[in-house]
C-alpha cells in the first residue's frame, strides 16, 4: 500500500492482496469510510493527471486506487510531477527515548533533500546531524518510505519521497542544537508512552511513519515484567 499525502488529504494505492496485516486493516477501514472516493485506473493519461485534479477537489479527503500493480500505478501518478528524494531519521537513545523536533509549530522528525552523488543513508545521517546538532549516530534499519506533495517556488506540483531509517544515538541527549535556518524551534526526547500527545500536532505522513515503526521497533513493544 502506498499513500501520497496532499497536506492531510491523500491518495491511497492498494491491491486486494496486501501482504502486511496492518495494511489489510487500514485498507478495510478506509473502504468502510463513507468519505472515501474510489478510482479504477484504466487509462494511463487519466492516471497521470489525477494528482493535479486531486489538488483542486479539496472536498475529497481520501481517494482509493485499486490496482494489480502498485508500483506501476505509483510511477504513473508521479510521471508529470517534479520528483525530490529525501532521507530522515527516527532517532532513539540508550534510555529508549525518541527524538522529535518542533518545526513551524508542528512536531516532526529530522529529514532533508538528497544531494548529488550521495547515497540515501548518508543523506539521512547528514540531515539528522545538521538539523539536531548531534553525531554518534548509527543506522539500524530502514523503516519505510513516505510520499507527500507540495507546490515548489515555481508553482509546480512536486512529490517528495522520504526514506526513513531507525537510528541509534550514543551521545549525550543534552547536546542537541536546533538548526534555526530550517525553522527548528525545539528538540525533545520523549518516552514512547508520551508519543500520542505529540501526534495530535503533526503531519499525517509522520503518523503513518510511526504506525509502521511501532510494528518494527522493540521500544514500542510491551515490556515483560521481571520477577
Which ranges hold each PLM region?
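Nudix hydrolase/Nudix homology domain
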Residues: 2-6, 16-18, 22, 27-31, ...
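Conserved Nudix-box catalytic region and its N-terminal flanking loop in Nudix hydrolases
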Residues: 27-31, 40, 92-129, 134
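Active-site beta-strand termini and strand-to-loop segments that position acidic
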Residues: 91-94, 167-169
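Conserved beta-strand and immediately adjacent loop positions that scaffold enzyme active sites
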Residues: 88, 97, 186
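Short hydrophobic/aromatic beta-strand or adjacent loop that forms the aromatic wall/cage
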Residues: 1, 86, 160-164
